[in-house]
Amino acid sequence: MTDVARPDVQACEQVRLTAWVRGRVQGVGFRWWVRARALELGLTGVARNLPDSRVEVVAEGPRERCAELLELLSGVPRHGRPGFVAGVTAEWSTARGGYSGFTQA
């Protein structure tokens, strides 16, 4: 009998991560950096500047990959992350679709 590896259901669950990033994150290439990391992770969504100087990141894909993006946004600066992140507020929800690739607005 052959054992078939079953993927972790939670890791494969399609989710939406909405993250609001505070700090010096506008005018420094931060959205372009987010887009590059999201595409590397196979995520879809958008990164956009908000009037209050935050950047909103909406990403959809497997929960595990979205969690990796959140760690890149909020963790110790690496991968040449531009600007300065003072804090990140995140919200998880069910993926809604509607994105084609990952854009910056």
Swiss-Prot record:
Active site (catalytic residues): R31, N49
Enzyme Commission designation: 3.6.1.7
UniProt keywords, alphabetically: Hydrolase
Annotated catalysed reactions: an acyl phosphate + H2O = a carboxylate + phosphate + H(+)
Domain Acylphosphatase-like: 16-105
Molecular-function GO term, any one: acylphosphatase activity
Keyword flag Hydrolase: yes
Family: Belongs to the acylphosphatase family.
Name of the molecule in the record: Acylphosphatase
Gene for this chain: acyP
